[in-house]
Regions:
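Extracellular/lumenal glycan-associated surfaces
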Residues: 58
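Beta-rich carbohydrate-recognition and catalytic domains
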Residues: 1-54, 62-120, 128-216
């Protein structure tokens, strides 16, 4: 199956689902988790950047023994709304009891350095413990594909990306995820415009791609 055939197959599956699932959503919500604590920008201290964040939200999390690793999204100014991803740790028992240190120490792990992150940065980590370290799915928002044809910051591509860290949280590599042959110039690589992905057992990955002409 070629890349274009794969994309058309995914579109057709999505269209079939939409034809069956359309309707009005009922006015009902059900909390699946107990709220323990809120962590806002006033509650954190970023150790490796001089400015205080204006927003701290959408954290990824990894439970390792009795320690919770948090990977929050950090926004330091609203003009460009560029994001970085930080790292903090909390004892599980303290988190369950609603106790956090004030301020909570946070270190920036990921920030925009590549063209595919050059507009709005690194967003919304989904973190996983992997052999030899940690893996973070995130959304890189920058210049990729047709977005490279203009300098306008209003034109960008949001792309599923993956960063790998060693045991000491030193970055080993990061890149956008694509299916197919390496090298965009071949026309045989399908980049995945999606904000949701997670590892399943082994090396299997669960994706929710965004497809042209279909609602997210």
């Amino acid at each position: 199956m070629t890349i274009s055939e794969l994309e058309e197959t995914l579109k057709e599956e999505a269209r079939l689902f939409l034809s069956r699932a359309r309707g009005l959503r009922g006015p009902h919500t059900e909390d699946l988790f107990a709220r323990r604590v809120y962590i806002g920008p006033e509650d954190v201290h970023v150790e490796n950047y001089p400015r205080r964040p204006l927003a701290v939200f959408n954290p990824g999390a990894v439970l390792e023994g009795e320690v919770v690793h948090l990977f929050p999204r950090l926004v330091f100014e609203y003009y460009s709304y560029a994001s970085a991803i930080g790292h903090a740790t909390l004892p599980l028992k303290d988190l369950l009891a609603g106790r956090i240190p004030k301020p909570l120490p946070v270190r920036i792990l990921l920030y925009p350095t590549e063209l595919f992150e050059a507009v709005r940065g690194c967003e919304d980590a989904r973190a996983h413990r992997r052999e030899g370290g940690y893996a973070l799915f995130y959304t890189g928002v920058g210049k990729l594909g047709d977005a490279r044809n203009t300098d306008s910051k209003e034109v960008f591509t949001a792309i599923l990306s993956l960063a790998e860290f060693d045991e000491a949280f030193q970055l080993k590599r990061k890149a956008p995820i694509r299916i197919g042959l390496s090298g965009e110039e071949t026309g045989l690589a399908l980049y995945l415009p999606t904000k949701n992905a997670t590892f399943l057992e082994g090396d299997h990955v669960l994706l929710r791609p965004s497809l042209p002409g279909l609602p997210d």
